[in-house]
């Protein structure tokens, strides 16, 4: 069984992160953030093979510009702890040619993200060598959490669903305000949606592997659900990954290297 990687996290101001900085890093560009006045220059970053913005058909053309897109996101989110974007990263296959990997990433993003109204900033990376000399092709997708309305304007992240009594009247809380639940306007953050995406990506990759006559497959399920006695790696986070890419060894990085080596040994014993 080939290795599977599909990770998603939120870009949050509460963690000291910005959408503009995240976009600049993934695209290998220099972008200025109007919200905080910071400029982020990643033009020396290697391994960025492709970067492009994919939009739903009703999105305004100005959002094809990365600087415009992410500065609009920064400006419309007023709260100092705002949740700005979803960040996806997914492993591509060394068994495929570069052009095949790019086509696969585009197809998945269009079919499962853009068609559902998501604005997608896609970047395909192919670093020279990582993790002991193993090529590591992968792609990133940065998506604003706030959706677009059908008229191309920015929509709401949530809407209120008021609590009602048996007669259908709104219920007040002790402080006199109406009781309500804040319900997301999209299903993008739901666990079941993530499960659907994870399986869809595995199915799409496996279909390509079969078309090429290759016997290896990937599995989106956890090791436990697969019935494998393997150790899951721990989440490193952007700061640890940045240090590791600079050649700075970290405790989390060392632990994951040990886990990967142990799992290789377990797989060889079970084979």
Spans of model-derived segments:
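N-terminal nicking endonuclease/strand-transfer module with a His-rich metal-binding environment
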Residues: 1-271
């Amino acid at each position: 069984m080939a290795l599977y990687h599909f990770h998603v996290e939120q870009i949050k101001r509460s963690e000291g992160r910005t959408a503009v900085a995240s976009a600049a890093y993934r695209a290998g560009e220099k972008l200025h953030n109007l919200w905080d006045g910071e400029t982020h220059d990643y033009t020396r970053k290697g391994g960025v093979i492709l970067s492009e913005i994919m939009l739903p058909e009703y999105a305004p053309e100005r959002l094809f510009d990365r600087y415009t897109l992410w500065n609009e996101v920064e400006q419309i989110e007023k709260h100092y702890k705002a949740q700005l974007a979803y960040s996806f990263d997914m492993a591509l296959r060394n068994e495929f040619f570069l052009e095949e990997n790019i086509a696969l990433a585009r197809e998945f993003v269009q079919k499962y993200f853009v068609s559902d109204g998501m604005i997608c900033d896609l970047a395909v990376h192919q670093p020279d060598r990582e993790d002991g000399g193993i090529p590591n092709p992968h792609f990133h997708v940065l998506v604003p959490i706030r959706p677009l309305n059908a008229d191309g304007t920015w929509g709401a992240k949530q809407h209120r669903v008021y609590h009602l009594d048996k007669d259908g009247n709104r219920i007040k809380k002790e402080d006199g305000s109406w009781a309500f639940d804040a319900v997301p306007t999209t299903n993008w953050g739901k666990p079941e949606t993530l499960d659907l995406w994870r399986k869809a990506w595995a199915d799409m990759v496996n279909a390509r592997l079969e078309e090429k006559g290759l016997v290896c497959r990937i599995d989106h399920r956890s090791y436990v659900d697969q019935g494998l006695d393997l150790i899951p790696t721990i989440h490193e986070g952007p700061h640890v990954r940045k240090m590791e890419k600079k050649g700075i060894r970290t405790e989390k990085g060392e632990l994951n290297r040990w886990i990967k080596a142990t799992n290789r040994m377990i797989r060889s014993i079970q084979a």
